Amino acid sequence: MPAEPLPATGAAVGIDLGVASLLTTSDGEHVANPRYLAASGATLLAAQRELAGKQRGSNRRRKARERVAAIHAKIRRQRLDHAHKTALAVVRGHDLIVHVALRVANMTRSASGTVDAPGTGVAQKSGLNRSILDAGWGIFLSLLANKAASAGRQLIAVHPANTSRTCPACGQCAAENRPSQAVFRCVACAHTGHADVVAARNILRAGLALQAARAA
């Protein structure tokens, strides 16, 4: 983490968090999401099955439990290291960084819901929850905030509404602008682009508008 303010770069960036890529920038850069939990899935599952088959209170069960814990600890270390390096690169390269305001804990609540409010699309939402947690959005945003503050960078969080549906060329906002998860195609002006890059550009624009409003 930078211990003192970094030299000015004159650059501003919007970042869109995702699961296909950890983040996509308004400059068109895609930062990989290593999916550490998924990558260790087979090893973890085998260790968990071995643990389940050991007799409670036995020495073998204790050792099996330690193996499961060690795998989880390795995944956490890998995820934290990647988040550190990614956040540091973003902070070093930009004076102004804009992201959407996300409540990751709320987004990853149990997909099954409650007795009074049962969940819908449980299997799909559970899969998305795992992907979000594996990507480490919360960890990354926390590190980004700390590093930005330490380096004297400005960090702005904006409302996510319509950032993925609005055309950066003409301003048209429509759900139909997203024919697929990865593609943006404006139904009004035919502007096309990668959907995540479009979202990041809209996030940056919203941040610059908020910055200007605060300065007025």
Where are the regions that the model predicts?
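Positively charged, helix-rich recognition surfaces that bind polyanionic ligands
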Residues: 1-216
